């Protein structure tokens, strides 16, 4: 089984250190990276795609970014799993909660590890940050039931 795993894209990052033109170019490059990730997923015929957090910046995301992500992942002919990180944490006002995702997209919503069986004998475990910073680690008190 082939998985494409990525993280820390930080779409809509403000790039405060850059001038307006450079910041705009950097944000455009981040979108291009997501487009490239989707292209590689198709080209390499991966079985699933996983974003392991910080896909976007919670404080700065726009409706356009929500639509871009929805459309990008809907075009993939494979499952997509999104695990919200500390910069794009899951909550009622998060992009993750507001978007009507296509059936191939699953968002981890709990702050404890949840299993998803990908294939016989292969389980993906994922969780969501539910705030900008979690004090407990996801592995504390975690036991795999065998």
What are these regions (language model features)?
Residues 1-68:
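N-terminal active-site segment of His-dependent metallophosphoesterases
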Residues 48, 59-146:
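His/Asp/Glu-rich metal-coordinating catalytic cores
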């Amino acid at each position: 089984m082939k998985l494409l795993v990525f993280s820390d894209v930080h779409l809509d990052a403000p790039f405060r250190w850059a001038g307006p033109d450079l910041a705009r170019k950097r944000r455009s490059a981040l979108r291009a990276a997501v487009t490239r990730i989707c292209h590689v997923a198709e080209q390499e015929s991966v079985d699933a795609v996983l974003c392991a957090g910080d896909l976007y910046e919670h404080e700065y995301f726009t409706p356009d970014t929500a639509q871009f992500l929805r459309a990008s992942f809907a075009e993939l002919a494979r499952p997509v799993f999104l695990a919200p990180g500390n910069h794009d944490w899951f909550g009622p006002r998060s992009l993750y909660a507001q978007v009507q995702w296509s059936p191939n997209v699953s968002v981890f919503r709990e702050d404890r590890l949840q299993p998803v069986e990908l294939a016989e004998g292969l389980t993906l475990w994922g969780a969501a940050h539910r705030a900008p910073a979690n004090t407990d680690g996801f592995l504390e008190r975690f036991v795999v039931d065998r």
